[in-house]
Amino acid sequence: MNLPALASRYPLRLTLTLSLLLLSPLTRAADEAPQLGWIPIQTIPAETSTTLDLTRWLSPGPAAAVQINPPASLSAQLDPSSLQLKIQTQPDLQGLIDLPIQIKPKKGEPLSGILTLAISPRSSHRFTFTGKGSEKSVCLAGAFNGWNATSHPLTREKGNLWFLSLPLPPGPQAYKFVVDGEWRIDSSHSLTIADGTGQKNSLVKIPENTNSATFLYADSRKPGLLTFLSAPAGWKSSSLSCVAELPDGTSRPIHATSPQPGRWEIDTSSLPPDSWVRLAAASEDGTLARPARARITTETKTDAYRLDHIIYFAFIDRMIDGDPKNNPAPDPKVEKPAQYLGGDLIGVRQMIENGYFEKLGINSLWLSPVNQNPPQSFQEYLPPGRWYTGYHGYWPLSSTEVEPRFGGNDALEALTTSARKHGLRVILDLVLAHVHEDHPVFKDHPDWFGSLTLPDGTKNLRKWDAETQFTTWFEPFLPRFNYDQPAASRFLISNAVEWVKRFNLDGFRLDAVKHIPQKFWSAFRSGLRTDLPVASDPAFYLVGETFMNRQGIASFVGPAKLDGQFDFPLYDTLLSTLAMESTGFSELEAATADSERVYGLETAMSPLLGNHDKPRFLAYADGDLPDPREPDEEEAGWKYPSAVNHPSSYAKLRMAFTFLMTLPGVPMIYYGDELGLTGAGDPDNRRMLPDPDKATGEAKTTLDHVSKLTHLRSAHPAFRYGSRRAIETKKDTYAIVRAYAEDRVLIAFNRSEKPVSLDLLVSPEIPDGSLEQELLLSKTSSAKTLSVKDGRLTIFLPPRSSSILVPAKP
């Protein structure tokens, strides 16, 4: 165990052992095996109290002893029933602590893991609010406290001035004041960010320690030896955490030697194949370098791990009409955008077999829900009360039958079989929150569902508050499961298992995650692993949809819950930077760094440019949204459907795709974005897919651009696993170096309307020599081959363009 200099002065406490009786009537059998997975580094500000939910990373099984060994400088209390670990850091503690965790089951060998705590120097920010004198209470709410409206009250200092000084982690922090129960932005602070509901939050940027611009990267990999370096070179660390992450999910400290400052060598000869090594370091003042991680063996297959996936979201009804015979007659009550339009599983299979996804560089398909939906249309609860069909698939009428209008069970089986032959994995959209009122399970087991009527007599419809977060219904015809009923949870988990077995699936996209209790997700993951060997495969992927801040999203993620979720907070900043150009690249870099810090290197988060619940990127890029005539983006889609009128909007889209495909994580493409499809809010963002074979002009240029990017991503492990260091972050220009073992890539952007020449310091990651540009968009671009001399490179970028450079082949 590596402890910082200050922490090493304290003797270890006696081992804290808690026997946990965790046999729950929810889902599990008495012989459930314990599970432990890799734990990302958890950053904790000094002199604060933090609670960590260990159920994200471990599942002890029905009865096991859990042991932790905290140093005396660290107050750690573990709740035996909830596995919540409360940590209190002392004022003089900073740096890195490796906290051993061990699960001792009644039978079998113990499982050991490492929880690395990064104790960052305390940095307080002073929030002030000037009132009118009549205010009785002013509180601060934000991502840092889970948007709790009462936990952080401000103090009245004098007159009408209220204040609160609060230690916050570095990065952008969204917040609002709650004044006598009313939510308000900070009128004295001009910086804001979209809150995901059409409104704004105030935003404050908490700077990192000025000495923290240090990054670690895996420099080389040889049999039995991994070498990591620092950028800048020669950086001196005072505390170190080096952890070996083994294929079975356990982890342990491993020794790293440092023959010179900024260089670390790790003997990996004792580790099993496919193990990973993660290195983290801090300076004497507690400043943390960005950690790095590398596999000890060379990658041999580009889809053997979750981080190798490139996902394409096929929204079935809006894809290709492969069999017109299964198309229903139009419903006269329903406007065309909400009708079934003919796309089906046969059409998606045809796209597989004609090589579209292979040419596009896709290796994973996310299919929208395939469950049979009701034959008739239904009226939406909210005004103006439009009628909709179940074309989207989110009104399950059956938990076993595939929608006949999509081709039925045979069509899905044929699709997954064909996908397997063509090297594609298939991830199915799974609806676990509700069923349709005509579903047999609702008729046979009404006790499995919550009530539509609240005790006060009001309807529990779309009430997103904490009190009704897990019980509210989306529509009166969509009964909501009650997860306090063990039989209901058992039904949902066993049904998910059957879908995988029947159709040879590779994972699930999970709908409405935050509206389902945490205890269910623990049971869901455990149930899949117990009943499905494939669920323990490193390529099996559970990805969720949660519209929350990063901390809220992360609370559902870990090897004992979901593998990742869609990164909507990063999406918001990506949109404002590259589509609307209301923020600069410095904000985008800060948001990306914030995601990396909160989620961690081990987490397979999914960045995106949009999905079926969000207006298309091009609707914002072309200026159709926000629409001053109609602030509601869905209504804008009905009244003023988007259209692309400016060629520059496609250039913005291509830059966004470059950013997406060079990020860490599992990038997701929403169908049609690769062809420049536009659209405002749902359902305008769900238009039929244009025929890719007929793509011309900007659409064809964009399609070719995306295909080039995806193939580059698959060819270069630095994109998928490597360190990421921004070497230029200005308003309109941006450059990033990524490094992994012997692989190096450079990504550069010019958002401005004028050509620019960038002089970049690319060392130490990229040595002197030649680099080749892989994205040459015009004759005005730089030469294909550029030279790095004395660690510097000059690159010319046309207006609104991006470039990727890789070392020239000898």
Predicted feature residues:
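Extracellular interdomain linkers/hinges and stalk-like, low-complexity segments
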Residues: A30-G61, G108-S123, N211-R221
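Low-complexity "stalk/linker" and mucin-like segments enriched in Ser/Thr/Pro/Ala/Gly
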Residues: A65-L83, K205, P247-P259, T785
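Extracellular/luminal low-complexity segments enriched in Ser/Thr/Pro
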Residues: Q84-L96, E265-S270
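A short beta-strand micro-motif common to beta-rich folds, especially ectodomain repeats
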Residues: Q94-K107, L115, W276-S283
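Aromatic-rich carbohydrate-binding modules that target alpha-glucans
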Residues: P121-P172, V178-P207, S241-W264
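C-terminal beta-strand-rich structural cap/linker in extracellular carbohydrate-active enzymes
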Residues: A174-Y175, L786-P810
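Substrate-binding/active-site clefts of carbohydrate-active enzymes
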Residues: Y305, H309, D317-F503, A523-A535, ...
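Active-site-proximal helices and loops of the catalytic beta/alpha 8
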Residues: L424, H434, N495-V497, K501, ...
